[in-house]
Amino acid sequence: MYSVESKFERDSRRDAQRTANLDFDARVPIPFSVFPSSYRSDAVPETTLTRVEGEVNLDRTSHVEREDTRTSAPLPDPRVYGREEVDIHISKDRLHAPSRKGDDFQVIYEDRAHKDSRVPEVELSRERWKRSENNAKQNKNKNNTSTRRSGDVLKAVSAKKVAPQAQTRADEKASYQLTQKARYRESTSRYEPLPPKPVYDQALESQLDITEREYRRRTDPTYDVNLSYGRHQAPVDSYQAYQPQQTSDVSLHRSKTEIDVSYDKAYTPKPLETRKGDSFSRSELTVESVPSRPSSASSISQVKVLKPYTAIDQPPARKMGYYDDDGNYHSFRRGVERAVDRITHPFHHHHHHHDREEVVIADERGPVRYRDGVREDVRIVEPRASKTTAESVPIPCHFIRIGDILILQGRPCQVIRISVSPQTGQHRYLGVDLFTRQLQEESSFVSNPSPSVVVQTMLGPVYKTYRILDLHEDGTITAMTETGDVKQALPVVTQGQLFRKIRDAFSEGRGSVRALVINDGGRELVVDYKVIHGSRL
């Protein structure tokens, strides 16, 4: 290797080498000034970063907040307050000490003035814990001594006065337990004295009697009950004198002084002794007033006469109407129905037959036009499109030609003349009846296939198609229907040499010859024909 001695020497290069390494490929010496580390100065201080890992143990850890953000401050001075509770316990022992006449008084003082060393929150939780513990102990003691304390009645009177006093903490705890014990006993023994059950039942029964009596008096005017008398209180011999009193009870002229029948005697309490003598004296007077038995029979007949009076108390029938002077009943409901019938059907009422006929004639008459002193009537027949829907079909007038078949006046006719009115646009057709050979004439009617379209229309017959099986010399044919029935001797219309045309088509034999037949009340007539070739069969 070649070694070249450096020409550049600087003071800042403490670790500079005197020789330089040559490149392996070029074999050219590389100067030291190319690298920036060669320009460092000894006067520039160097900074060294050192990372030290250690473990720090704190006295107390916090699970809620960070250790470096926890602060502590002394609590403010608690307020100085105090309470004095004076509990006076009065106990009477009836079972164990019946001869004891004196009362025991016990005064308990409680002072809660000095609580400087306690925190309010801690004291509150401690007080609640003590209260729950004391309640559990009291419940246990009560279960053990419930038989011994059944006759004791405990009354407590507490007077609270706000005045701070000094006392030890042990006295405060003892007074707190005694106070809780006294309060617990007072709450349990307060509801022990109950009223006697017979008094409560008697009051309840009396209230039920009053309620029933008031309700029956409102619903039944003939009901009246005198609670001062009961049949179970009367002697046995008063039963004879009690029968006429029943008749006076149902009579219309009653008075409150009379003896009434008690329907709820089983629920009424017994009256006082002073009222018993009064009721007996009245019963003796009633016995003297009825000397003989026929008077009771007359009273019984009087009861029968007054029986229809009870039907008046029944609710009347809910009828909507009135009675006239002749005693005939007229219903308001039927009158309303008749009024509605007159409004909806003004021409069908039984009092206006002549009006109905005049209106119908005016409707069928149609418009009237006078021309050159001649009165022309145009009759419009609207219901024709709906009368024979199964036997006819509507045909527009611009499709009808002379020789076609139409229904004129309800008869199948062949058209021989057509006339059109330039003013109204109606078509008038004249035709010959195919069965009776009579002339029929009729005008077209207006149909509305769409709301804004008006078309002059006529009715045409519905044709039946029969298969021709044979031809006869008398001008009749034998045909078969679509259901397979065979029709014998069907006549053919004579106009237009139709029979000759059918015979020519049938003799050619190029297809099936079909006859078009119209029906008129069971009579059939062949009016046309058509040939269906073999390709269509």
Swiss-Prot record:
Any one Gene Ontology MF annotation carried by this entry is:
ribosome binding
Positions in coiled-coil regions: none
Q: Name one GO cellular component term.
A: porous cell septum
Instruction: Report biased composition (Low complexity) as residue ranges.
Output: 135-144
- Biological process (GO) annotations? positive regulation of translational elongation; response to wounding; translational elongation
Q: What happens when the gene is disrupted?
A: Leads to an increased sensitivity to stressors that affect the integrity of the cell wall and membrane, such as SDS, the antifungal agent fludioxonil, the acyclic sesquiterpene alcohol farnesol and the cell wall perturbing agents Calcofluor White and Congo Red. Does not affect the resistance to hypo-osmotic stress but leads to a higher sensitivity to physical damage. Results in the lack of Woronin bodies. Attenuates virulence in a murine model of infection.
Q: Where is the composition biased (Basic and acidic residues)?
A: 1-17, 59-70, 116-134, 272-281
Q: Where is this region: Disordered?
A: 1-20, 59-79, 116-200, 269-295
Q: Which CDD domains match?
A: S1_Hex1
Annotated keywords: Cytoplasm
Top-level taxon: Eukaryota
Q: Where is this gene product found?
A: Cell septum; Cytoplasm
**What does this protein's UniProt record list under function?**
Major component of Woronin bodies, fungal-specific organelles that occlude septal pores in order to separate intact from damaged compartments. HexA binds directly or indirectly to the Woronin body tether that in turn is anchored at the rim of the septal pore. Woronin bodies are important for stress resistance and virulence.
Similarity-based family = Belongs to the eIF-5A family. Hex1 subfamily.
Describe the protein's quaternary organization and the partners it interacts with: Forms oligomers. Self-assembles into hexagonal rods. Binds directly or indirectly to the Woronin body tether lah.
Question: What is this protein called in UniProt?
Answer: Woronin body major protein hexA
Q: Provide the species name.
A: Aspergillus fumigatus (strain ATCC MYA-4609 / CBS 101355 / FGSC A1100 / Af293)
